[in-house]
């Protein structure tokens, strides 16, 4: 053949190198399919210890290969994209599928809207593009425009997962469906609430029913019908306190929610503790050259011994700053003053902090034996109290006899757990009340020792509200119990197993342990060093009355000399802050900057997303002048 002859193949094979490619199939672009998954990591994008062992042994890999406590490294073969080399190199409109999936929903929506296709490509892609564009629009409407399309489901918050499910339903034409939503506004900035509520109302207009569990005031006011359950929590709740429209509840004196709607908490917007950054008396943390993830901040100041709220629209960089910059660098520098910084070029003022603690919503206690009484540290005092009774001393019982973790005093049948595990063969195991001790955890002899007519088993079954009065004469026990009451946990029992507590309950119990250390009631000397606390949305799951309690508790920590930094969207909390740091102006690549900072009143004067909603909020919550 002539030297300039070129050979082409109709069978997706290269005549020069011999490479043969399979026919393009939708499964080729799915990492859940063996056809599309990276052969090295089996479509996980990461290599864990279990996966490495399976590879060495030549075993098949399943979902159990991804354990939370294992070390993970990004798969070098696919670079974390999860796909095989063929799928990674197919381009459409100039982009590969990993490049498209790395976009946020907002970026992808813009890219798909502005595609320039020839007539043939448009004819082929029109139906698919219509579906893609509408689904991306739905994600934006429920406030998830900042999420990347490749985001792994386990990394999503509960609120984000719920809103993704909601977005998927917006694209259907179903009628007569009853949707149940549990706090869909979690993690949403108040500005974005309106979009979410509009999306919810669209579902109702299609002929569907929505039952929404919610504490957000705006959501409650937009509801067609409200059912108020109360009046308290635990055994003090469960009763219908009122139902009807907002006006019906506001006129109902028995409705706790109605009272809060009719008489909102007053806020002046003026902080309790003034912040003047040029005041030489004020100690501060100053970060310069912050560049973590989407953050691009020249300088950001956090006043110490103040209550600071970091706010901003979803995806603006709040968690990145508080966790990956502030918390991470303080933790490093408090261990080693010369430790390298991450995500920031310079940090000054860290020497004024004694310790840093993230009070998060992870479960407390390592096993089911942990309970509120053991976690806050009063169980030891309770055991000592029972060991000091005449009956215990006459029998020769010491404090260990009153521990359900010790065989000498624990029920021999359930080993001090109060529950027995019943194996169900092919079904999950079931826990049932122990018949021997009736759930009291102790053996009969130990339960015969009484203090004020109650056994130690009876004490563990007490609600905290009852226990406050019962132990009123014992300050070392009563004080932490009163603190638990103050943070709205009075309905918990002292012996409630820790795994049954919600994330919000666990977070508030952690706050109680810190308050118990600083002894802010004046009757005990402070024991804790200057601590900086970082909290991420502590108001999740709280009723409006409990939010007020929480705000007062956080202020008590600051009054005791600590620093509190809170990531929060709740406007009641923001209005009570000494200092607000507002990040934005949008989420993702359009965020990451300080758009406003100052007192609530100062931020409310700005035309930022937070400033606009805070201005309206303060106007609606002005204190009523007494005549």
Outline where the language-model segments fall.
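Conserved phosphate-binding elements of NTP-dependent enzyme cores
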Residues: 1-627
């Amino acid at each position: 053949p002539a030297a300039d002859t070129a050979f082409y193949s109709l069978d997706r094979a290269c005549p020069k190198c011999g490479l043969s490619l399979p026919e393009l199939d939708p499964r080729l672009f799915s990492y859940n399919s063996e056809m599309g998954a990276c052969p090295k990591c089996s479509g996980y994008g990461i290599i864990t210890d279990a996966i490495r062992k399976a590879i060495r042994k030549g075993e098949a890999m399943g979902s159990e290969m991804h354990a939370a406590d294992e070390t993970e490294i990004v798969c070098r073969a696919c670079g974390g994209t999860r796909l095989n080399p063929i799928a990674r190199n197919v381009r459409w409109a100039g982009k590969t599928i990993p490049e498209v999936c790395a976009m946020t929903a907002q970026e992808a929506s813009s890219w798909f809207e502005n595609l320039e296709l020839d007539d043939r490509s448009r004819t082929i892609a029109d139906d698919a593009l219509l579906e893609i564009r509408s689904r991306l629009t739905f994600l934006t409407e429920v406030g998830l425009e900042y999420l990347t399309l490749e985001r792994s489901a386990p990394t999503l918050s509960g609120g984000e997962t719920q809103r993704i499910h909601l977005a998927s339903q917006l694209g259907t034409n179903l009628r007569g469906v009853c949707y149940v939503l549990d706090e869909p506004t979690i993690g949403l900035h108040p500005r974005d609430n309106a979009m979410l509520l509009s999306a919810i109302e669209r579902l109702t207009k299609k002929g569907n029913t929505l039952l929404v569990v919610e504490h957000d005031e705006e959501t409650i006011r937009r509801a067609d019908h409200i059912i108020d359950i109360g009046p308290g929590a635990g055994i003090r709740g469960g009763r219908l306190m009122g139902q009807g429209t907002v006006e019906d509840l506001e006129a109902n004196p028995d409705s706790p929610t109605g009272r809060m709607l009719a008489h909102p908490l007053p806020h002046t917007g003026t902080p309790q503790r003034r912040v003047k950054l040029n005041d030489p008396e004020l100690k501060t943390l100053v970060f310069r050259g912050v560049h973590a993830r989407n953050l691009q901040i020249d300088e950001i100041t956090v006043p110490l011994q103040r209550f600071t709220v970091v706010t901003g629209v979803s995806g603006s960089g709040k968690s990145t700053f508080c966790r990956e910059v502030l918390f991470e660098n303080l933790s490093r520098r408090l261990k080693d003053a010369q430790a390298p910084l991450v995500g920031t070029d310079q940090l000054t003022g860290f020497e004024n902090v004694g310790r840093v603690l993230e009070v998060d919503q992870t479960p407390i206690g390592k096993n089911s034996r942990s309970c509120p009484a053991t976690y806050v540290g009063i169980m030891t005092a309770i055991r000592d109290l029972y060991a000091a009774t005449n009956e215990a001393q006459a029998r020769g019982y010491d404090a260990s006899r009153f521990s359900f973790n010790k065989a000498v005093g624990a029920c021999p049948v359930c080993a001090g757990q109060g529950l027995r595990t019943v194996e169900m063969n092919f079904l999950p195991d079931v826990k049932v009340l122990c018949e021997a001790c009736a759930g009291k955890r102790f053996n009969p002899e130990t339960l015969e020792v009484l203090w004020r007519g109650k056994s130690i088993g009876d004490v563990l079954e007490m609600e905290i509200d009852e226990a406050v009065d019962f132990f009123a004469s014992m300050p070392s026990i009563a004080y932490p119990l009163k603190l638990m009451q103050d943070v709205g946990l009075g309905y918990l029992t002292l012996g409630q197993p820790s795994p049954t507590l919600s994330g919000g309950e666990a977070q508030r119990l952690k706050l109680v342990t810190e308050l118990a250390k600083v002894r802010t009631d004046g009757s005990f000397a402070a024991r804790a060093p200057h601590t900086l606390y970082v909290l991420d949305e502590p108001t999740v799951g709280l009723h409006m009355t409990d939010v007020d309690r929480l705000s007062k508790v956080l202020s008590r920590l600051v009054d005791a000399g600590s620093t509190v930094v809170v990531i929060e969207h709740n406007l009641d909390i923001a209005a009570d802050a000494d200092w607000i740091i507002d990040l934005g102006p949008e989420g993702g690549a359009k965020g990451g900057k300080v758009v406003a900072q100052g007192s609530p009143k100062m931020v409310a004067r700005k035309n930022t997303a937070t400033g606009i909603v805070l201005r309206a909020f303060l106007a609606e919550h002005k204190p009523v002048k007494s005549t």
